Amino acid sequence: MFLLDHDRAGGYWGAVYTFCAVKGLQVVIDGPVGCENLPVTSVLHYTDGLPPHELPIVVTGLGDAELGREGTEGAMSRAWKTLDPLLPSVVVTGSIAEMIGGGVTPQGTNLQRFLARTIDEDQWQCADRAMTWLFTEYGMTKGRMPGERMRPDGAKPRVNILGPMYGAFNMASDLHEIRRLVEGIGAEVNMVFPLGTHLSEVRNLVNADVNVVMYREFGRNLAEILGKPYLQAPIGLESTTKFLRSLGELLGLDPEPFIEREKHATLKPLWDLWRSVTQDFFATASFGICATETYARGIKAYLEGDLGLPCAFAVARKAGEKTKSDEVRGLIRQTRPLVVFGSINEKIYLAETKAGHGPAASFVPASFPGAAIRRATGTPFMGYMGSVYLLQEICNGLFDALFNILPLASEMDSAAATPATLRRDMPWDADAQAALDRIVSQHPVLTRISAAKSLRDAAEKAALDQGAERVVLEMVEALGDATMDRKGGN
């Protein structure tokens, strides 16, 4: 089966999400008719939950004439005239425009060109360059760093949060949590960049004492250029504590009082969940994750390292590296984790496993692509609040797995009539029983009883249908092969 499921977008998507997050900057997408449908309509309007016309975006809408004869300048001039001529504007090239040499800014406009390199860069690589470009173009003066405004005596230390932008999974909640942690130890947030920053304020990035980079996929290059110490936003219990202590050391603040308060307040539900009746399943509640490196690496370290839950697989989507989706699909089929964190791709692969015997795993959105709106700030993955939320999702996943075992009345009523009831005393060959045990062992411990009953009934029914007096190895192997075929789509 040929499999090529994309797990990221091209470069100009990352540029659009970066530039649209900045106030005072207008964006022109140089591309063919309909090129805005996916990055703008499906993501900004649906996933990010922004109404149409909320952001100053126009498209050149290249047709056959522009692509084959006239070029893109005329279309770009028409697009620019629909914008405010007094505000700065940037042209972002799509792959089609790049192939025909588009993106050339017409005379008499204030358009600046940003080459997205859509053909050879993904959205995260381009977003990293776009963040740096904003600072070098609007923060620096002729290549010189702006002067730093000294902090008044007695003022709180200042911290930048780099990376929040549109098109980033769970951004609102994680930004809210990182801001809460920074302010909790006594610092103040100097700027969140690029989200919500006005173009005239970009130069103020140099006024921070420390930078926090939200994502591993983009933002680190800008942090290097700013020349201040920077930390990676944390996921998990131990990681968050280390982050707060490192941040406190860099800023000259004592984070211990805040950490102690968090143990008795924010983290109280975590201790309760850990000591609740669900603890009986934690040692065998396996999980799998396929997400951006930020979340795949952080969630694995937390659930496996801090809590001791078995990790069936962890696949990180890294900037500039292709993810082997067929391998991810195979891992879900082979390891059968109880909870799967991922994108719409993994949700589809997980749905395929429902064709086999036994209950299906539960799915938790943890990455784009996928239709998951996360505008509310109550679903963090980062920080202490994220630690509580993730464990809560694991517990809910356990309950979902148990729910999937329950027989539905409609399914029971629709069962095909059988000429005879299954014989509970039907003998089994030893090798057939061993094969059944091997297949059942691939299921999570929590759901093995249900899977074993389902497989045993199917094997005995196959024996009765064939007029056999006992269950033999070939009957069980046929069930296993059929299950793999249905799950694999072969």
Curated annotation (Swiss-Prot):
It comes from the Bacteria. Gene3D superfamilies: Nitrogenase molybdenum iron protein domain. GO terms for molecular function: oxidoreductase activity, acting on iron-sulfur proteins as donors. Pathway: Porphyrin-containing compound metabolism; bacteriochlorophyll biosynthesis. The keyword Transmembrane helix does not apply. InterPro entries: BchZ, ChlB/BchB/BchZ, LI-POR_suB-like_C, Nase/OxRdtase_comp1, Protochlorophyllide_Rdtase. Its EC number is 1.3.7.15. Disulfide bonds: none annotated. Keywords: Bacteriochlorophyll biosynthesis, Chlorophyll biosynthesis, Oxidoreductase, Photosynthesis. It catalyses: 3-deacetyl-3-vinylbacteriochlorophyllide a + 2 oxidized [2Fe-2S]-[ferredoxin] + ADP + phosphate = chlorophyllide a + 2 reduced [2Fe-2S]-[ferredoxin] + ATP + H2O + H(+); bacteriochlorophyllide a + 2 oxidized [2Fe-2S]-[ferredoxin] + ADP + phosphate = 3-acetyl-3-devinylchlorophyllide a + 2 reduced [2Fe-2S]-[ferredoxin] + ATP + H2O + H(+); 3-deacetyl-3-(1-hydroxyethyl)bacteriochlorophyllide a + 2 oxidized [2Fe-2S]-[ferredoxin] + ADP + phosphate = 3-devinyl-3-(1-hydroxyethyl)chlorophyllide a + 2 reduced [2Fe-2S]-[ferredoxin] + ATP + H2O + H(+). CDD domains: Chlide_reductase_Z (cd01982). Belongs to the ChlB/BchB/BchZ family. Chlorophyllide reductase is composed of three subunits; BchX, BchY and BchZ. Forms a heterodimer of one BchY and one BchZ subunit. This is Chlorophyllide reductase subunit Z. It comes from Rhodobacter capsulatus (strain ATCC BAA-309 / NBRC 16581 / SB1003).
